[in-house]
């Protein structure tokens, strides 16, 4: 799929029901099953008065069910950044109820989401998702107080388009595995939105250890979504899995860890620079230690005294956002 599907068309676009969406161990979820599961949850959510629903999931397929059902039902998905019961109870004013794949012991509304192992005999497209709909994410911020970040669906779609234009050919035929959670924007974008937009099957569980990565079946080629925290713990003594492409974000990737990764997987990592507030800003194919960052198309940096302001198609505010990082630009617009 060269043209990424916008989120509102993940279900409604004319595609075969047997299109694989996600897998876990020996089980595969298809588009037909996703359509069935989302339709059931949409019907349930329409009967609820609450507008804002927190998504707390370990299974990425069921996360997608909840995300799509919330939006198609006209609700607002809230991603609190965790699934800890004590914190959810403290944050209850932020949402009307909780959608989860587990029976959480919390006060208030809880809907446990499951897959019914069924498809719909005759698919009736769900109501369109209004382009003004959005997802709310909460980050801890520097003070530890939850900070609300709004991500409009149109911005998520534009982000998928930028990534498809940059990496699309290399992603063809890949299955997506990840060591990051969809409870943060990086995981939401790369583990959920990108594979769904590109029609790439995704692994429904998170990889916590290098041993899990090494144990992946060799009948697939993988796009591995990871972070410096995971890559520094790789064990080169393990058998290397067939990873075709590696993306890292969430911090600086030390050169020694790049070298270890290349020695094991025989591929150079692609790094992403950005933040929850800004979305993706720049990338680099890390074949050298001090390689500069290259901005994505439409991303513009503006120097303001000692600070830097950025505008981009992904930033809703017309005036852009100010960055905390100190960036040094060369004559070609690349930076370090």
Question: What do the predicted segments below correspond to?
Answer:
Residues 8-9, 17-47, 151-154:
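Conserved AMP-binding/adenylate-forming core of the ANL superfamily
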Residues 5, 15-17, 115-138, 169-176:
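Conserved pre-ATP/AMP-binding loop-to-beta segment of ANL
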Residues 93-103, 150-166, 171-233, 245, ...:
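AMP-binding/adenylate-forming
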Residues 204, 266-306, 316-320:
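Conserved ATP-binding loop and adjacent catalytic segment of the adenylate-forming AMP-binding
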Residues 30-31, 134-161:
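Conserved AMP-binding A3 loop
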Residues 43-83, 174-182:
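Conserved AMP-binding/adenylate-forming
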Residues 235-289:
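Gly/Ser/Thr-rich phosphate-binding loop
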Residues 302-336:
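Conserved ATP-binding/catalytic segment of the ANL
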């Amino acid at each position: 799929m060269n043209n990424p599907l916008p989120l509102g068309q993940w279900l409604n676009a004319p595609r075969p029901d047997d299109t694989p969406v996600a897998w876990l161990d020996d089980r595969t979820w298809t588009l037909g099953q996703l359509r069935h599961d989302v339709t059931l949850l949409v019907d349930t959510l329409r009967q609820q008065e609450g507008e804002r629903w927190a998504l707390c999931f370990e299974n990425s397929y069921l996360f997608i069910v909840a995300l799509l059902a919330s939006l198609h039902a006209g609700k607002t998905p809230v991603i609190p950044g965790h699934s800890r019961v004590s914190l959810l109870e403290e944050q209850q004013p932020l949402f009307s109820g909780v959608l989860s794949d587990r029976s959480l012991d919390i006060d208030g509304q809880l809907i446990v989401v499951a897959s019914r192992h069924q498809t719909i005999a005759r698919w009736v497209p769900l109501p369109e998702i209004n382009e003004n709909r959005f997802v709310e994410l909460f980050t801890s911020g520097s003070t530890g107080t939850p900070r609300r970040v709004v991500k409009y669906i149109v911005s998520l779609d534009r982000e998928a388009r930028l990534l498809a234009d940059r990496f699309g050919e290399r992603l063809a035929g890949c299955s997506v595995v990840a060591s990051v959670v969809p409870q943060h924007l990086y995981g939401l974008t790369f583990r959920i939105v990108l594979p769904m937009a590109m029609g790439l099957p995704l692994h429904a569980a998170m990889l916590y250890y290098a041993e899990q990565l090494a144990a992946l079946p060799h009948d697939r080629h993988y796009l591995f979504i990871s972070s410096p925290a995971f890559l520094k713990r790789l064990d080169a003594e393990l058998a290397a899995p067939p990873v075709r492409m590696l993306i890292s974000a969430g911090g600086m990737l030390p050169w020694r860890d790049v070298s270890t990764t290349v020695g094991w997987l025989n591929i150079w990592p692609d790094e992403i620079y950005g933040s929850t507030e800004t979305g993706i800003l720049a990338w680099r194919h890390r074949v050298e230690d001090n390689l500069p960052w290259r901005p994505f198309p439409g991303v513009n940096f503006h120097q303001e005294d000692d600070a830097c302001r950025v505008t981009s198609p992904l930033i809703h505010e017309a005036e852009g956002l100010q960055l905390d990082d100190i960036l040094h630009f060369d004559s070609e617009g690349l930076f370090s």
